[in-house]
From Swiss-Prot:
<protein>
    <recommendedName>
        <fullName>Small ribosomal subunit protein bS18</fullName>
    </recommendedName>
</protein>
<dbReference type="GO" id="GO:0006412">
    <property type="term" value="P:translation"/>
</dbReference>
<dbReference type="GO" id="GO:0022627">
    <property type="term" value="C:cytosolic small ribosomal subunit"/>
</dbReference>
<dbReference type="InterPro" id="IPR001648">
    <property type="entry name" value="Ribosomal_bS18"/>
</dbReference>
<keyword id="KW-0699">rRNA-binding</keyword>
<comment type="similarity">
    <text>Belongs to the bacterial ribosomal protein bS18 family.</text>
</comment>
<comment type="function">
    <text>Binds as a heterodimer with protein bS6 to the central domain of the 16S rRNA, where it helps stabilize the platform of the 30S subunit.</text>
</comment>
<dbReference type="GO" id="GO:0070181">
    <property type="term" value="F:small ribosomal subunit rRNA binding"/>
</dbReference>
<comment type="subunit">
    <text>Part of the 30S ribosomal subunit. Forms a tight heterodimer with protein bS6.</text>
</comment>
<keyword id="KW-0694">RNA-binding</keyword>
<dbReference type="InterPro" id="IPR036870">
    <property type="entry name" value="Ribosomal_bS18_sf"/>
</dbReference>
<dbReference type="GO" id="GO:0003735">
    <property type="term" value="F:structural constituent of ribosome"/>
</dbReference>
<keyword id="KW-0689">Ribosomal protein</keyword>
<dbReference type="InterPro" id="IPR018275">
    <property type="entry name" value="Ribosomal_bS18_CS"/>
</dbReference>
<dbReference type="Pfam" id="PF01084">
    <property type="entry name" value="Ribosomal_S18"/>
</dbReference>
<keyword id="KW-0687">Ribonucleoprotein</keyword>
Amino acid sequence: MKRDRGRRKKKICSFCVDKIAVIDYKDTPRLKKYITERGKILPRRITGNCAHHQRMLTVSIKRSRHMALLPFSTD
Protein backbone atom coordinates (compact mmCIF):
# COMPACT_ATOMS: atom_id res chain seq x y z
CA MET A 1 0.00 0.00 0.00
CA LYS A 2 1.13 3.47 -0.81
CA ARG A 3 1.16 6.05 1.94
CA ASP A 4 0.38 9.68 1.31
CA ARG A 5 3.36 11.59 2.61
CA GLY A 6 2.05 15.04 1.80
CA ARG A 7 4.03 18.07 0.78
CA ARG A 8 6.99 18.95 2.88
CA LYS A 9 7.97 22.51 3.60
CA LYS A 10 11.19 23.55 1.88
CA LYS A 11 13.95 23.98 4.41
CA ILE A 12 15.88 27.22 4.33
CA CYS A 13 19.50 27.86 5.17
CA SER A 14 19.77 29.34 8.66
CA PHE A 15 23.09 30.96 7.80
CA CYS A 16 21.56 32.78 4.81
CA VAL A 17 18.64 33.97 6.93
CA ASP A 18 20.97 35.34 9.61
CA LYS A 19 23.26 36.75 6.88
CA ILE A 20 26.35 35.05 8.29
CA ALA A 21 29.24 35.36 5.83
CA VAL A 22 31.82 33.27 7.70
CA ILE A 23 31.17 30.28 9.95
CA ASP A 24 33.65 30.42 12.82
CA TYR A 25 35.12 27.19 14.18
CA LYS A 26 35.12 28.69 17.70
CA ASP A 27 31.31 29.04 17.72
CA THR A 28 30.77 25.59 19.25
CA PRO A 29 27.14 26.07 20.39
CA ARG A 30 26.08 26.74 16.79
CA LEU A 31 28.23 23.91 15.41
CA LYS A 32 26.83 21.38 17.89
CA LYS A 33 23.38 21.78 16.30
CA TYR A 34 24.74 20.24 13.09
CA ILE A 35 26.33 17.16 14.70
CA THR A 36 24.55 13.98 15.79
CA GLU A 37 25.00 12.53 19.27
CA ARG A 38 27.42 10.04 17.68
CA GLY A 39 29.56 12.88 16.30
CA LYS A 40 28.56 12.70 12.63
CA ILE A 41 27.95 15.83 10.57
CA LEU A 42 24.31 16.10 9.52
CA PRO A 43 23.72 16.13 5.75
CA ARG A 44 22.33 19.02 3.79
CA ARG A 45 18.97 17.40 3.10
CA ILE A 46 18.30 17.22 6.84
CA THR A 47 19.69 20.59 7.93
CA GLY A 48 18.40 22.59 4.97
CA ASN A 49 21.65 24.48 4.47
CA CYS A 50 22.67 25.75 1.05
CA ALA A 51 25.67 24.07 -0.60
CA HIS A 52 28.01 27.00 0.09
CA HIS A 53 27.27 27.13 3.81
CA GLN A 54 27.26 23.34 4.17
CA ARG A 55 30.83 23.22 2.83
CA MET A 56 31.88 26.03 5.20
CA LEU A 57 30.14 24.26 8.08
CA THR A 58 31.97 20.99 7.36
CA VAL A 59 35.36 22.72 7.30
CA SER A 60 34.56 24.59 10.54
CA ILE A 61 33.47 21.41 12.32
CA LYS A 62 36.63 19.61 11.21
CA ARG A 63 38.80 22.52 12.39
CA SER A 64 36.97 22.60 15.69
CA ARG A 65 37.54 18.87 16.14
CA HIS A 66 41.23 19.27 15.36
CA MET A 67 41.51 22.04 17.97
CA ALA A 68 39.69 19.76 20.50
CA LEU A 69 36.69 22.10 20.82
CA LEU A 70 34.33 19.39 19.54
CA PRO A 71 34.65 15.62 19.98
CA PHE A 72 35.40 13.31 17.06
CA SER A 73 32.98 10.77 18.48
CA THR A 74 31.32 9.82 21.74
CA ASP A 75 32.57 6.59 23.25
